[in-house]
Amino acid sequence: MAKTYLLEIGLEEMPAHVVTPSVLQLKERMIKFLKDARLDFEDVKTFSTPRRLTVQVLGLADKQADVKKEVRGPAKKIAQDADGNWTKAAIGFSKGQGASTDDIVFKDVKGTPYVFVQTFTAGKTAAEVLTGGIKDVITKMNFPTMMKWSTYSFKYIRPIRWIVSLLDDEVVPVQILDVAAGRVSRGHRFLGHDVEIATAADYEADLASVQVVADAAKRKATIREQIAALANERDWQIKVNEDLLEEVNNLVEYPTAFAGDFDTKYLTIPDEVLITSMRDHQRFFYVTDAEDNLLPHFVSVRNGNTDHLENVALGNQKVLTARLEDAAFFYHEDQQHSIQEYVERLKKVSFHDKIGTMYEKMQRVMIISDFLADRFGLTETEKNQLHRAAQIYKFDLVTGMVGEFPELQGVMGDKYAVLKGEDPAVGQAIREHYMPISADGDLPKSKVGAVLAIADKVDSITSFFAVGLTPSGSNDPFALRRQAFGIVRIVREQGWDFPIRQLEADIQKELVAHDATYNLDFEKQTAPVADFLTDRVKQWFNNRKIRYDIVDTVIKGSRQDIREMFKAADVLNAHQDDPQFKDTIEAFTRLLRITAKAKLAADDLTVDPSLFENEAEQHLYDAVLELQKQFTPAMSMEDRFKALAALRPLIVDYFEQTMVMSKDEKVRDNHLKQLLTIAQMINVMGDLNQLIVK
């Protein structure tokens, strides 16, 4: 008969951000344990609050399945001596299987008789299996941070205070340090009391009786409904931030949402400051009207019931008011100084002690951004906006507001720049230069912001590499991988030409030419920045499950241009299942293998038709001449591939009728020039020799 097993790990309050991943880990470990133990089950349900991680196994088999198997031992000639007596090898083998020599049978394996015995292992009961393994399920969990308590050396996310371990209505014994498993759980810290769980199936209902909503999904739905009800009552608009909702949900066991207010005078502060104060610092949901204007109200969630809710709201209002008062002070005070004053202060702000100051970084970024602006074809207006943004883009780091709210760097730069009369495009670029702030974060929307973001990240990576501070393994203290991945994403979004190695060399030359290296010695660079960026391109492809051989093909192309890598990968990925794809690639790679051995100057590939020896040469020559007229930078990668693929039958005929490596040197060189011309066009796709076609 199917059973239900319950395991609840009771803890001191966990940080909100670890609750969900931890209970999912517990579920995964429980599933693996049960499967490894051959104990069948139907489902594993999770429950979690800040004080508990729980799994409930449904439809659990009452015992393991019995196991019958046939085990092969030594060959007969080893198992018996010349007189037919059992040898030590046979006796030892049978004992090892829990059998005797009487159980041995012989079976032929490829013409040789071997010893075999049949073994039978009776399945253990579910209680026996659980008793033997649940301790490991609990103790072998991993957490981002761990702690010890009392005099124990054992580490866990938080001290374990109780354990409930029930198989239906029977306690399954588990002992962790001084905590023995039982059937008693704990209710809400303030509203509830200890509660005895009658059976594993009663867990959720029993906890509800002591003011604990154990199901995280139901608790979250309750919070969402309560917020919506408050908004509807007051004609408010509340955009529920899902990350905040998840955090709040993992801070409470019995949620009650309530509304609060703050003085309208604080609405003169930028919205971003108000939202940051409420959402990020106080975990409040902010309120707007139908036109998306902030209103002087908020919604919060308490871990408790509605008793004395007015006092709770007033307490939260006081805390928020204190923070907004600080913000108002800094907002007013910061505007008493010019942008140039803040820029001058950056001369005393260290970017890194081995690299220099933030001011010096800005000077390098100004040169890099000017160089990239020309390369990317920005208009004169955009170039001027970019140059001005690069001159001042870090100034807000030394403002009081960013000192109090570091997460608003860039945002306040935008706000203050516009207040001081700067072009809004300059302010937008200052805001956007941090983007993207994560692997899938928002990208800059403006070209000016995109170039500044690339320039800033290129400088950071180049500077750290120049002083030998490169990421290794999982160690990346300066987030250089994230910044490099950001460059890759921005380049793909903008579609800019970005030959990695050429740009690395050109940018370093620009900095040296403008005497803006500030003692950075690029000659001492321990690893090429280009290789580092190329690895991030690989990461982008791998994240999207692009075939590894397609990735190698485009990565190992001669130009190593990020834009061309993306275009080529898109085309090869789109055509890999075409009926003629295999034949086309094989024709190309045969041609490429031959031309790879050619020792001819790539700048003199003039073909002499008078040296042709068959019609196939002429037909291919005519087709290539026509293709060369179309094969310009304006031609899309898709059209290039299709046009080259159309040459396949002509290339096949060419090889069937032509002895490429003719004994006549002039004829041979003419053949190679003709093929090299095609190879140069094929190589735009990358190194097709890396492709695996079946």
From Swiss-Prot:
Cysteine disulfide links: none
Chain segments annotated as transmembrane: none
GO biological process: arginyl-tRNA aminoacylation; glycyl-tRNA aminoacylation
EC code(s) of this entry: 6.1.1.14
The reaction(s) this protein catalyses: tRNA(Gly) + glycine + ATP = glycyl-tRNA(Gly) + AMP + diphosphate
Subcellular location: Cytoplasm
GO molecular function annotation: arginine-tRNA ligase activity; ATP binding; glycine-tRNA ligase activity
UniProt xrefs under PROSITE patterns: AA_TRNA_LIGASE_II_GLYAB
InterPro entries noted in UniProt: DALR_anticod-bd (IPR008909), Gly-tRNA-synth_bsu (IPR015944), Gly-tRNA-synth_heterodimer (IPR006194)
GO cellular component terms, semicolon-separated: cytosol
UniProtKB keywords: Aminoacyl-tRNA synthetase, ATP-binding, Cytoplasm, Ligase, Nucleotide-binding, Protein biosynthesis
Protein family according to the UniProt entry: Belongs to the class-II aminoacyl-tRNA synthetase family.
UniProt-recorded name of the protein: Glycine--tRNA ligase beta subunit
Organism listed in the record: Lactiplantibacillus plantarum (strain ATCC BAA-793 / NCIMB 8826 / WCFS1) (Lactobacillus plantarum)
Lineage: Bacteria, Bacillati, Bacillota, Bacilli, Lactobacillales
